[in-house]
């Protein structure tokens, strides 16, 4: 009788964080009859600086169209702001242009069309904003806790996170004239030592420009000097003077992965799991899947540790690829960018031919022997 009574008790599920993984988890749980409670320390979903991000086939292989995948397989509906039909890759002395359907651009942060707001519009569960509830508090009151806080600090605090990189991110929203389906990426150690930089348009008149580079073991110029150098390069490349309307600067942003996806009845999702891909730093696809998979486990549709194994593998392959790129000096980067104008650009980057991160790392490995 006691066992039967315990099994019949309804789960009380707390989701700590109203970001991508937390909201995706809530949507799936609701579909299967559960009513999670969401605790968000800020005033709204995506209550932070506005920035652009991408979901591209390189991050979602073997899935070629992530939007269609989430819509058809999970009834999770998201809208991008534009598709990516042209990629321009820059190095110190080379430039290549690839004209292929490579993915989509979307908005994050404090914006009505951000991914966070789109997901929040699909959630019916109660969300407590300005929440001061700690993980320890929730653990005492709920049977299951989804850690979806948007950063890795809780996972680090619980000794369940391996840090691979601490990086600096500095970016801005700029006004100018842009092709909204064209993105730019820079690999240039004079701009972002052992890192990368990019320009992603919000519209025909606004774009997001960002530099990212690791902090450990580097003797580099100060952040301000690097940013000014990059800003001048962007203005020169775009052949216009760009007006900065908003900025953000993040230091010690952790890139890493959890040691165990689930400990007891706590699920580590999003950046607490390790959704941020080390190569180029985007992680929305993985973040959404961790939220979905945590919900699947709670609904008896799979085991979280098993479902997330391919995501762990994808993270490790991305880390290898980043390590390879970090070893490249500017002349090697020039050579690779020049090659993209030929076979690599016209065939390898097609969605139907693009290799997995693992395969791409093997292709590039001979360059850094």
Stretches with model-predicted labels:
Residues 8-21:
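Beta1/beta-strand and adjacent pyrophosphate-binding region of the FAD-binding site
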Residues 41-91:
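N-terminal FAD cofactor-binding segment of flavoenzymes
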Residues 333-369:
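C-terminal auxiliary extensions adjacent to catalytic cores
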Residues 21, 44, 152:
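Conserved Rossmann-like nucleotide-cofactor binding loop
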Residues 16-18, 30-52:
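Glycine-rich FAD pyrophosphate-binding loop
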Residues 220-294:
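FAD/FMN-dependent oxidoreductases across multiple families
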Residues 258-260, 296-342:
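Active-site-proximal substrate-binding core of FAD-dependent oxidoreductases
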Residues 113-237:
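Predominantly flavin-linked oxidoreductase catalytic cores and closely associated redox partners
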